[in-house]
């Protein structure tokens, strides 16, 4: 056994090609010929005649060589001799004195029933003699191992068995499960397979045939050509040992040997097949092709699997028309391999059925020779499930440089020949606009390619075979499309109304136009024919219809969350500081006689002011004539010294602490909007600031102060609809100067000078301002002018902690400020002031 392990051989499909058979003309009379040549010719003629008598299909007979013909002939005669003895004894017992015609009819039924039993059997029948020769194997062995019936009959069974299981198989062939017993010491071991020679017994030495000692059930691994993973398939052998009659074998001395035992077993796969495998294994079919793979015939099972009749299958031309485009080059490679070696090997690909569906098959094709030359192709195909097909597709090793989805045009050295639905880049130019490339390189047609090429077979296929069925069968009616289009066009407006902002509305409209460009435009131009347009085919290929689009848009609409939308008009100060300031203002005890708290409904947030500004153009707030005199009150700045508002004073230079305060002033309240119910209330302006380490230089300025909010918050007004003002807009630090200015129309003898400042342009946009007022009132000061008589630093406040007083001149009363005056004719307001230096005023810095 050790000596045979070095030379292990397994059964394979490789066969010797037969010698070329040519019909020689009969030599004329009188011409001498070679006697050995005549003998060989007569022998070949008899072998051909003998091969035609074998019970095999013609395609199997044509591939047999001389030794195979002789081997199968002997096997057939032995099998016929056995069945003659076995069937004669059994038929005589069963029939008795029955009518011969009736008995013949019963034999026909038995033969037909046996064929059906083989198809229903999950396995194949195997008969092995005691000397390990395959006496019989059913034709269904091809479905499990891939070997033809003619390949294994009268061959050694050890060529099919794994080397590690050969000893076990020989042990099962012995009646006592002990093949080491050797009654004849002259018998040696089998040098070919390393196993001992079989022992022949007389029937008297053996137990009865129906004894339980003769039953066998074991597992063995057999060579399998259909399994690409390991090459072996574990089979379960279940049967019994029986006598093999009618063999007429002789011993070494020439004496006739009695019938010997043989294993009659049914081999079934150890792993039971799935339900789908049981369904597909019975539909192995064969097709006949020309050398260029043009189909010329198909058996009955192939017609059941594919749905074509034999005439329909043969009238379409090249067989590549039935192969999926992604598998054409893969099958062409197998075709070339078959031309070189005579056999294609296993190939898994998709075939087109009559109902335009793709069926996965596992095929093996080989040449059939006639007179030593290839005559036609026989392809054996086994249907596979979709799961098995996809698994083989993933395991497929792509050896070709181009695939269907990447390089067909390069492979065939032509521009893209595929229809728009099959083009990897389906970008088509608009009608009437053609580039230079399209003019110089025309698209190939069916007439410009070779009719027998793969490209021609691909172009002859219908586009619809590569389209998946749509998810819904609802027709694309024009009224349905119009209704869906109207519903889609109304969605952005509804979304904008929910959001309450025009910006969101424009964004939604723009987004809808970008996402659905096919819906923008004339329907009659885009969809002249709903059944033939490219968009319909693409949507049908993706399995999407208008109902699906409607559902997706509804899901996107109802799933939108507008609570997290941030408006660009939101203020920059954080919510915590706003809350702190609002609480401080609400808790501040303002005891001035003219002070009245404004209702909170008008001062909830700056959004109401923004809403009012967006509703219409701004209105000039009318000024009221009544003046409210209030007592000095402590300002909000006393509380702001304990906090920092977004680092407002981070960039200010604190050279020296300067205490300052502000005198009492009489100001006039005003209303921002005439339609507010709180606009008629009077609000004071009082300010007093504690010691703050902030100093700032300032220069004479000229500015028109816009209405200020009452809550010391930064307001960002969207002033897109406002007209630009011809008056300048300066920094926020200069807004504090205007509180000391009075109209120029009043007479003041203290300061005859007047400084003229060139006006600047006020741009319409987002106006941001800070104010320092305790009350929620809106105040508006006219344009005022601050002119120091002597250049240099001047004090802004007149009251300091050291008791120093600054005498300044203020108007006795502020006249009515009429806001109805045109902005281009507003007179400058003049305010005389007297500057006096103080010892504790280090620098003229101003907040």
UniProtKB/Swiss-Prot annotation:
Location of the protein in the cell: Cytoplasm; Nucleus
Motif Nuclear export signal, chain ranges: 64-72
Post-translational modification comment from the UniProt entry: Mono-ADP-ribosylated, leading to inhibit transcription activator activity of AHR.
Domain of life: Eukaryota
Domain annotation bHLH: ranges: 27-80
Segments of skewed composition (Polar residues): 440-452
Region called Disordered, residue ranges: 1-39, 430-452, 825-847
Residues in PAS domain copies: 120-173, 281-336
Single biological process term from Gene Ontology: circadian regulation of gene expression
CDD domains recorded: bHLH-PAS_AhR, PAS
Domain-related comment: The PAS 1 domain is essential for dimerization and also required for AHR:ARNT heterodimerization.
Known function: Ligand-activated transcription factor that enables cells to adapt to changing conditions by sensing compounds from the environment, diet, microbiome and cellular metabolism, and which plays important roles in development, immunity and cancer. Upon ligand binding, translocates into the nucleus, where it heterodimerizes with ARNT and induces transcription by binding to xenobiotic response elements (XRE). Regulates a variety of biological processes, including angiogenesis, hematopoiesis, drug and lipid metabolism, cell motility and immune modulation.
Protein name: Aryl hydrocarbon receptor
Classification lineage: Eukaryota, Metazoa, Chordata, Craniata, Vertebrata
């Amino acid at each position: 056994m050790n000596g045979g392990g070095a030379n292990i051989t397994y059964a394979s499909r490789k066969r010797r090609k037969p010698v070329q058979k040519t019909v020689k003309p009969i030599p004329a009379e009188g011409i001498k010929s070679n006697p050995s040549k005549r003998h060989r010719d007569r022998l070949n003629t008899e072998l051909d005649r003998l091969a035609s008598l074998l019970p095999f299909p013609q395609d199997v007979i044509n591939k047999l060589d001389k030794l195979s013909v002789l081997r199968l002939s002997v096997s057939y005669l032995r099998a016929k001799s056995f069945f003659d003895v076995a069937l004669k004894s059994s038929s005589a017992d069963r029939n008795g004195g029955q009518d011969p015609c009736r008995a013949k009819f019963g034999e026909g039924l038995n033969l037909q029933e046996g064929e059906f039993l083989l198809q229903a059997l999950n396995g194949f029948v195997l008969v092995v003699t005691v000397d390990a020769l395959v006496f019989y194997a059913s034709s269904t062995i091809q479905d499990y191992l891939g070997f033809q019936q003619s390949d294994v009959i009268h061959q050694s069974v050890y060529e099919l068995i794994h080397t590690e299981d050969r000893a076990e198989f020989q042990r099962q062939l012995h009646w006592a499960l002990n093949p080491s017993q050797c009654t004849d010491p002259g018998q040696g071991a089998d040098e070919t397979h390393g196993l001992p020679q079989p022992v022949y017994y007389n029937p008297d030495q053996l137990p009865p045939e129906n004894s339980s000692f003769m039953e066998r059930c074991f597992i063995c691994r057999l060579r399998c050509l259909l399994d690409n993973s390991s090459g072996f398939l574990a089979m379960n052998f279940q049967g019994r040992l029986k006598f093999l009659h009618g063999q007429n074998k002789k011993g070494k001395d020439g004496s006739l040997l009695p019938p010997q035992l043989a294993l009659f077993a049914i081999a079934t796969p150890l792993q039971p097949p799935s339900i789908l495998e049981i369904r597909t294994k019975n539909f192995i079919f064969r097709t006949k092709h020309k050398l260029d793979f043009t189909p010329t015939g198909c058996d009955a099972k192939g017609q059941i699997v594919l749905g074509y009749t034999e005439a329909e299958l043969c009238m379409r031309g090249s067989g590549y028309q039935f192969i999926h485009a992604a598998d054409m080059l893969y099958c062409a490679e197998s075709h070339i391999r078959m031309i070189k070696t005579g056999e294609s090997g296993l190939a898994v690909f998709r075939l087109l059925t009559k109902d335009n569906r793709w069926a996965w098959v596992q095929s093996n094709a080989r040449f059939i020779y006639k007179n030593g030359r290839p005559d036609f192709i026989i392809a054996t195909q086994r249907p596979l499930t979709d799961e098995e097909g996809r698994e083989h597709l993933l395991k497929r090793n792509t050896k070709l440089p181009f695939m269907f989805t990447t390089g067909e045009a390069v492979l065939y050295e032509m521009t893209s020949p595929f229809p728009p639905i099959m083009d990897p880049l389906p970008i088509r130019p608009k009608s009437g606009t053609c580039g230079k490339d399209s003019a110089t390189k025309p698209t190939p047609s069916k007439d410009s390619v070779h009719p027998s090429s793969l490209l021609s077979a691909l172009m002859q296929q219908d586009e619809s075979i590569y389209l998946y069925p749509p998810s819904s069968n609802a027709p694309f009616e024009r009224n349905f499309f119009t209704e869906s289009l109207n519903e889609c066009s109304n969605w952005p407006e509804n979304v904008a109304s929910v959001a309450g902002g025009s910006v969101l509305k424009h964004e939604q409209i723009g987004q809808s136009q970008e996402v659905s460009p096919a819906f923008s435009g004339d329907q009659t131009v885009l969809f002249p024919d709903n059944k033939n347009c490219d968009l319909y085919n693409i949507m049908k290929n993706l399995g999407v219809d208008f109902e699906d689009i409607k559902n997706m848009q509804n899901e996107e609409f109802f799933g939108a969350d507008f609570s997290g939308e941030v408006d660009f008009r939101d203020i920059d100060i954080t919510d915590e500081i706003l809350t702190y300031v609002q609480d401080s203002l609400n808790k501040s005890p303002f005891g001035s006689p003219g002070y009245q708290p404004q209702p909170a409904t008008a001062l909830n947030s700056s959004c109401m002011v923004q809403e009012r500004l967006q509703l219409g153009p701004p209105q000039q707030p009318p000024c009221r004539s009544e003046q409210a005199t209030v007592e000095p009150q402590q300002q909000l700045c006393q509380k702001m010294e304990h906090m920092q508002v977004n680092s407002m004073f981070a960039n200010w230079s604190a050279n020296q602490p300067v205490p300052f305060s502000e005198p009492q002033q009489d100001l006039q309240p005003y209303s921002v909007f005439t339609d507010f119910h709180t606009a008629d209330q009077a609000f004071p302006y009082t300010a007093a600031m504690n010691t703050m380490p902030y100093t700032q230089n300032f220069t004479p300025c000229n500015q028109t102060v816009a209405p200020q909010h009452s809550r010391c918050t930064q307001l960002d007004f969207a002033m897109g609809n406002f007209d630009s003002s011809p008056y300048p807009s300066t920094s926020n630090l200069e807004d504090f100067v205007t509180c000391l200015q009075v109209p120029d129309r009043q007479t003041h003898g203290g300061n005859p000078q007047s400084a003229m400042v060139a006006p600047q342009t006020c741009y319409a946009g987002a106006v941001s301002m800070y104010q320092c007022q305790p009350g929620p009132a809106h105040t508006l000061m006219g344009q005022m002018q601050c002119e120091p008589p002597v250049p240099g630093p001047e004090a802004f406040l007149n009251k300091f902690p050291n008791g120093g007083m600054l005498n300044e001149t203020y108007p006795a009363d502020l006249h009515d400020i009429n806001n109805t005056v045109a902005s281009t004719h507003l007179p400058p307001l003049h305010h005389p002031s007297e500057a006096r230096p103080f010892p504790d005023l280090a620098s003229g810095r101003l907040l």
